[in-house]
Design a protein with these regions (language model features):
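Active-site mouth loops of central-metabolism enzymes
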Residues: 29-43, 164-172
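Conserved beta-strand positions
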Residues: 32, 61, 195-197
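Catalytic domains of carbohydrate-active enzymes, especially glycoside hydrolases
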Residues: 43-66
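N-terminal small/glycine-rich loop or linker at the start of catalytic domains
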Residues: 16-35
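An active-site-proximal structural segment forming one wall of the substrate-binding cleft
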Residues: 56, 114-135, 163-194
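Aromatic- and acidic-residue-enriched carbohydrate-binding clefts of CAZyme catalytic domains
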Residues: 23, 66-122, 138-172, 200
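Acidic, proline-/serine-/threonine-rich low-complexity intrinsically disordered repeat tracts
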Residues: 2-19
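Active-site beta-loop-alpha junctions enriched in small/polar residues
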Residues: 35-37, 64-66, 133-137, 198-200
Length: 200
């Protein structure tokens, strides 16, 4: 018969957790999948306007969900001892997104469009919660990795290759994913009240 010791969190940690939970409980969030389908800045602003009208507090914007539809001005990445030029990464991501779904309305939002959108949302009192999915829902990123010369980035399950999931045993693919997400996280840092970072 084993006795389990009960360990209580320090009062400060418990109080902080309660404050965070209370704040999150007051959130009313609308989620838009702007990764699978392209949404123009005007469409997103209209969604923000409607969200405000209906009492929402935040817009959860999936820019990386199968497709990757947000491009920074500088997309250069250093992964280990390899540097990928910005234009090469942009072209590979754009091609990867088009391979997932070549949306006739557009491919991606630019950095200036996103910065403007964040400012617009803030002025309306709407927070922006950006998301780039990993290790799954990465179709465009996996295709981009292959175009950039990373071999076999896709997870393989008994001979069946996943179109969406990175192989967590492929160190180069994992490092590339982390570098890409770090790049986006650095851009969004301080621009969003809830900074979440998907890590592999």
């Amino acid at each position: 018969n084993k006795e389990v010791a009960k360990v209580e969190a320090p009062p400060v940690a418990t109080e902080r957790a309660a404050q965070v939970n209370e704040k999150l409980a007051k959130k009313k969030i609308v989620s838009i999948d702007a990764g699978r389908k392209y949404f123009s800045p005007d469409q997103l602003k209209e969604i923000i306007d409607k969200a405000k009208h209906y009492g929402y507090t935040d817009l959860h914007l999936l820019v990386g969900n199968d497709g990757l539809r947000f491009m920074l001005d500088d997309m250069s990445l250093t992964v280990g001892d390899k540097t990928y030029a910005s234009d090469d990464v942009k072209r590979a991501v754009e091609n990867g997104t088009n391979a997932y779904y070549n949306d006739p309305n557009g491919n991606h939002l630019s950095e200036s469009e996103m910065t403007d959108l964040i400012g617009y949302a803030k002025n309306k009192g709407i927070g922006l919660i950006p998301t780039v999915n990993s290790p799954g829902h990465m179709d465009a990123i996996l295709n981009a990795m292959k175009e950039l010369g990373i071999e076999k980035p896709n997870f393989n399950y008994f001979g069946k290759e996943s179109e969406r999931t990175v192989d967590l045993d492929n160190e180069k693919a994992v490092a590339f994913t982390k570098a890409l997400i770090d790049k986006y996280a650095a851009y969004f840092a301080g621009k969003s009240e809830i900074d979440r970072k998907s890590v592999v």
